[in-house]
Amino acid sequence: MAYAVYLSGEIHSDWREEIMEGARALGLPIEFSTPVITHDASDNVGVAILGDEDSGFWKDHKAAKINAIRIKSGIENADIVIIKFGEKYRQWNAAFDAGQAAALGKSYIVIHPEDFTHALKEVDAQAMAVAQTSDQVVKILKYITTQE
């Protein structure tokens, strides 16, 4: 069985590449999709296309709405959503994506350091698995696709 997997969450490390490379190396039948992961492009898309704003709020609002087109589609079309909460920044968008996945009845896997367990207890409670490393996620994907 082939799966569509959406990789959501922090954009400051190469965790997505680790998971995609791990799945490819094992020959897993998975098609991955992601949000826009170039930070500057994601932050500036609204003003780059629709024009400058005097307020940071409206600049961010434009970008968030345009980025949401891809994010919403990615989550809706996924069989599994993988959401990473990184250590450096508070990823409110990752928590929002987890909420969307849960509301849509999507299976999702969360990755975060143990220190975040209390803060993310509600997010974790709805997750099908809570991992701390990309390698653990690859092992989960291997199990669900190969039964090994």
Task: Indicate residue ranges for each PLM-predicted region.
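Conserved catalytic or regulatory cores that recognize and/or transform ribose-phosphate-containing ligands
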Residues: 1-148
